[in-house]
A protein has these predicted regions:
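N-terminal segment immediately downstream of the Sec signal-peptide cleavage site
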Residues: 10-19, 26
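Compositionally biased, low-complexity segments of secreted and virulence-associated proteins
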Residues: 106, 170-187
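Extended beta-sheet lipid-handling architectures
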Residues: 76, 95-97, 171-173
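Glycine-rich, hydrophobic membrane-spanning regions of integral membrane proteins that mediate transport
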Residues: 45, 50-92
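Short acidic DE-rich linear segments
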Residues: 258-262
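Outer-envelope beta-barrel architecture signal
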Residues: 94-98, 185-189
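Membrane pore-forming effector domains from diverse proteins
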Residues: 2, 20-28, 33-38, 55-65, ...
């Protein structure tokens, strides 16, 4: 059964899982490992699985215009979920989220629109060929055990943007207008706040750097020290979730899975 948490699944229709606290340092070809209920970022793929003599590390294609996501709108989310997402975005931009609930106090629902979305990706077919020829690093004895336990995942695609557009609506479904100067003062100078339409009902929040807000990953399967298969992670089945400064978490539809990022 899939996860029904609207926070975890609001990108599912676009084929991505959610980064609860958007970051700049999530990218393809990063290795995640699952131990019991914890997923920890282990390092880069080539550090754990050295390139073989015939197939080099796959080339990552960066900053591809994600036309299937740019300009698209999420479904209406509850005010609490929407403000939680918006707060995490503003926080990642270096702004303050204190007082946002007051600015949107008349709202019942919130929807997001993604602008100028860029994708970084590596084709799974290339990763498949690389892994078939790669060798487990000689000094990665623990990683070898984790591979045999099918506990390793690799990120394959990330989506990022500098600008996130928000539209809030009241119970009747009518958009509500907010006070731009008031919100700009609340969030601070690091976040640019501007109307994204003819009225102040659709607001664009823009930061200085593109933030990764969605990702795709694949689980790797090994047998007797050799790679055998991969399985793409189902969109919406997990999400990066920041719980404290030094740790992130991956939430799944089964027990909570913690993702620590050094």
């Amino acid at each position: 059964m899939g996860n029904s948490d609207p926070f975890l699944t609001y990108l599912k229709s676009f084929g991505y899982s959610v980064v609860r606290l958007p970051r700049i340092d999530i990218r393809p070809l990063q290795v995640l490992v699952r131990e019991d209920t914890r997923l920890t970022r282990l390092g880069n793929l080539e550090t754990i699985l050295h390139p073989g003599p015939q197939v080099a590390l796959p080339r990552m294609t960066e900053n591809i215009a994600a036309a299937n996501i740019s300009g698209e709108r999420t479904r209406d989310l509850s005010l609490g979920v929407g403000l939680s997402i918006l707060g995490s975005v503003i926080g990642a931009m270096g702004g303050s989220q204190m007082g946002l609930d007051v600015s949107y106090q008349r709202a019942k629902t919130v929807a997001f629109e993604f602008s100028d979305v860029l994708e970084d990706r590596v084709d799974l077919a290339d990763i498949d060929q690389y892994l078939t020829n790669a060798d487990i690093a000689a000094f990665s004895s623990h990683a070898a055990k984790l591979l045999e336990a099918d506990s390793i995942y690799v990120t394959t695609s990330t989506i990022k943007s500098r600008k996130f557009i928000v539209q809030a609506s009241e119970t009747s479904g009518s958009p509500i207008e907010v006070k731009l100067p008031e919100i700009q003062k609340l969030v601070g100078a690091k976040v640019k706040v501007a109307a994204a339409g003819k009225s102040n009902s659709k607001i664009a929040y823009e930061g200085e750097q593109p933030l990764v807000f969605g990702f795709q990953a694949a689980r790797l399967f090994y047998e007797q020290g050799r790679y055998t298969a991969f399985k793409p992670m189902e969109p919406g089945a997990g999400a990066f979730e920041a719980r404290q400064a030094a740790a992130d978490y991956l939430v799944t539809d089964s027990p909570f899975v913690r993702l620590d990022i050094p």
